UniProtKB/Swiss-Prot annotation:
This is Probable 2-(5''-triphosphoribosyl)-3'-dephosphocoenzyme-A synthase 1. GO terms for molecular function: ATP binding; triphosphoribosyl-dephospho-CoA synthase activity. Belongs to the CitG/MdcB family. The lineage of its organism: Bacteria, Pseudomonadati, Pseudomonadota, Gammaproteobacteria, Enterobacterales. It catalyses: 3'-dephospho-CoA + ATP = 2'-(5''-triphospho-alpha-D-ribosyl)-3'-dephospho-CoA + adenine. NCBIfam families: citrate_citG.
Length: 302
């Protein structure tokens, strides 16, 4: 079965953005990612991937619950723009916890979007800060603000030795050196900017097909992102297996060649059998789509 979903074309780049518009753009990013099909090991229209406790309807309910919170992150970033960015993160945490609570209520306790709340909460606050400062909304400026908001988050939250049992995130970092979502945020979404966005833009330009561009970008993320969701489910062996399989498909041309979609479906079936789900890469794909709506801007913003 060849599953294909037509996704909307990108809108013109945003030069400005009202708080209410932000809610809608984030919702579209999350729904575009969720409905993209086929996605190996992930919830999509075809199946629920390696997840027995969630489906596409749960992701849609979750998106409806959390999207309105992006305006609140935006306002907090806007109102605290005069403060040093690293002092704002503590003010964003209560919003994140409340947003997560609404997500859990909408999904009957299932974690559908915790990583996305973290990523898009920071992105929304970063946009609020930039607009308050009269700075243009550009990919690199937005990501630079995210990096500033997240400064030293890995050292503070993952590397410190604590009494008692380590969390999964602490274990991933202290045992394997994997910093997960926190490290990606602290880097200003380096993986998205240096790998995902260039692939996405190239495929859109060459093929005029957002659906293919997103699938090819997902393969690149699966191939090179050290996804701690995979480590949680399958250890380093699971991570390396997914990376190797994605790299193999890319060497063959990915979804841009005949049989590419079918190969993605076969990999989906295999990851379901192995109970592997690259959820971190899915979050970064949604971030990629979101950021693609803004101009790139200068590489080193002032």
């Amino acid at each position: 079965m060849n599953v294909s979903v037509v996704t909307e074309r990108r809108t013109p780049a945003y030069s400005s953005l009202a708080a209410g518009e932000l809610n809608g753009l984030v919702a579209r990013a999350l729904l575009t990612e969720a409905r993209l099909t086929p996605k190996p090991g992930l919830v999509d229209i075809r199946n629920s991937g390696a997840h027995r406790d969630m489906d596409l309807a749960a992701f849609e309910r979750s998106t409806t619950a959390i999207a309105p919170w992006m305006e609140k992150f935006f306002i907090m970033g806007n109102n605290t723009a005069a403060l040093a960015a690293e002092n704002v993160l503590v003010m964003l945490r209560p919003l994140g916890m409340a947003c997560e609570n609404d997500m859990l209520q909408a999904t009957n306790g299932v974690n559908t979007h915790r990583g996305a709340i973290f990523a898009f909460g920071l992105l929304s606050a970063a946009i609020g800060r930039l607009l308050a400062r009269g700075e243009p909304l550009e990919q690199n400026r937005i990501c630079d603000q995210v990096a500033r908001l997240s400064r030293n988050i890995v050292a503070h939250e993952l590397s410190a030795k604590k009494a008692g049992k380590l969390t999964k995130s602490e274990t991933h970092f202290q045992c394997y050196g994997l910093s997960g979502a926190r490290g990606e945020a602290e880097s200003g979404f380096r993986t998205v900017r240096t790998q995902a966005l260039p692939v996405f833009n190239r495929v859109v330009q060459e093929h005029d097909d957002t659906h293919l561009a997103l699938l090819q970008t997902l393969l690149h993320l699966m191939a090179w992102n050290d996804d701690t969701n995979l480590v949680s489910r399958g250890g380093l062996e699971g991570l390396y297996y997914v990376q190797q399989q994605a790299q193999k498909l890319l060497w063959q041309g990915g979804v841009l060649v005949e049989g590419g979609i079918e190969a993605m479906q076969s990999l989906d079936d295999e990851l379901i059998l192995r109970n592997l789900s690259p959820g971190g890469s899915a979050d970064l794909l949604a971030v990629t789509w979101f950021l693609s709506h803004f101009p790139a801007g200068s590489l080193y913003p002032e």
